[in-house]
């Protein structure tokens, strides 16, 4: 009889229920799998790639969490044609498995808007959510600073990701916290607009990087 964690893994990766899909993969249960159940989970996930069971990048995410070496080549092949959210999740999975050197650039590129690449707010939101996995590199920080300027879901998420990266720097952490709370403070006499706070944060963080 399968364990509770295996059942939770299977449901979160393969169920078509809207609630389950919305909640995403059960990371805790996946990370608890071991022995034969871990091998079986990996087999099912690899088998599902490219089939109708492969929905919302869930098998890709789970294979990354399992650090599946068997998934490396299939995921690299997937990356050649993947777009948007699936491209981000595939690059992140490869980074989790083997510190794939191109992953950071691939995800940062998903934030860029060009003549041939219109804004995909959900993809932008996911990109800024996962960039802290790559650490406080100059490329990551600059990309998050650019994204923070936007007053939308991606911009707010970028602010939160920067706060995660600079959690040990009190002045930066507090200023980013002000940006996140900004709409709630509009009634205060000393209210400072979001663009002003963002500019202050960008200047402070860039000075920090120059040290």
Task: Pin down the residues of each PLM region.
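Structural detector for internal amphipathic alpha-helices that build alpha-solenoid repeat scaffolds
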Residues: 18-36, 54-68, 74-80, 87-100, ...
């Amino acid at each position: 009889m399968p364990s509770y964690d295996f059942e939770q893994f299977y449901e979160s990766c393969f169920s078509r229920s809207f609630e389950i899909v919305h909640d995403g993969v059960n990371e805790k249960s996946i990370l608890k799998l071991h022995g034969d159940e871990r091998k079986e989970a990996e087999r099912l996930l690899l088998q599902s790639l490219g089939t109708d069971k492969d929905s919302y990048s869930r098998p890709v995410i789970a294979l990354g969490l399992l650090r599946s070496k068997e998934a490396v080549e299939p995921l690299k092949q997937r990356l050649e044609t993947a777009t948007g959210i699936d491209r981000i999740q595939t690059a992140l999975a490869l980074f989790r498995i083997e510190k794939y050197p191109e992953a950071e650039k691939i995800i940062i590129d998903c934030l860029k808007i060009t003549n041939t690449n219109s804004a995909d707010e959900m993809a932008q939101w996911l990109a800024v959510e996962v960039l802290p996995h790559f650490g406080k590199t100059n490329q990551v920080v600059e990309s998050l600073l650019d994204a923070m300027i936007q007053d939308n879901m991606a911009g707010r998420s970028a602010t939160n990701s920067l706060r995660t990266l600079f959690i040990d720097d009190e002045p930066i952490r507090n200023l980013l916290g002000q940006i996140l709370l900004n709409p709630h403070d509009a009634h205060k006499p000393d209210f400072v607009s979001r663009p002003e706070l963002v500019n202050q944060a960008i200047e402070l963080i860039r000075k920090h990087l120059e040290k």
